C-alpha cells in the first residue's frame, strides 16, 4: 500500500515532481504504472476528503492513464524500430517545470540576501537607447534571462553603499506584474532594461525578475532577443490581458 500525503502543490506537475523525488525515480525512465498509481491515490484521497479538485489534476490523470495503457501494449517488430516513447512529452514538461523551480529558488535567495540595502543615485541611461527594429521570432531561454539579470544587478551594486541598512518598503510580485502588464497596454512590446533605473533597491530588481519568470511561464508575456548579449524585448503573450 502506498502512502498518500496531502501536501499543498502548485498544480499537477508539482505533485508529479514531488512523487518522482520522493521515490527517487529516474525522470528519464519513469515507471508509469507505479507513478500513475501514486498519483491516482492522491486524487482519490482528495475526493474522499471532499477537497475541491482543480480540473487540471483530472486532465493529467487521464493523460497518465493513456500513457500507461500505451506502455502496456505489445509492440510489433516494425514499432521497435521507431523511437517513439509515449512518455517523451511528459518528461519534457517535467524537466522544464523543474528548471523553473530551481531558477525561482536562486532568485529568491538573491532577493533575501539584499532585501535591506539600496541606493538612489542619478544614472545616465542614454547608452541604453536601442534600435526599435527587432525580430519577434527569436526567443531566448532562461539562461540568457539570468545573464541579463546579473548585468542589471551588477550595475545597481556599483552604486550601493554596503554599510547602510535602511527599512525597506515591500515591493511585491503582484505590483511588478501590474507594472509589466501596464507597460504593454498601449504598446505590444518594450525594452527589458527600461524597467530599471539602476537606482532602485536590489530587492525590487529581483522581484521584477521573479514576476517576469512567472508571467513568461503563464504565457502572459514572451521574452525575445535578436542575438546573444543584445537587448531583450518583452512582448505580449497569448494569455495577456489588461484590467
Swiss-Prot record:
Keywords: Cell cycle, Cell division, Chromosome partition, Cytoplasm. It is found in: Cytoplasm. This is Segregation and condensation protein A. Component of a cohesin-like complex composed of ScpA, ScpB and the Smc homodimer, in which ScpA and ScpB bind to the head domain of Smc. The presence of the three proteins is required for the association of the complex with DNA. HAMAP family: ScpA. It comes from Staphylococcus aureus (strain NCTC 8325 / PS 47). It holds the Pfam family SMC_ScpA. One of its GO terms (biological process) is chromosome segregation. The keyword Cell cycle applies. Belongs to the ScpA family. The keyword Coiled coil does not apply. InterPro entries: ScpA, ScpA-like_C. One of its GO terms (cellular component) is cytoplasm. Gene3D superfamilies: 6.10.250.2410, Structural maintenance of chromosome 1. Chain E.
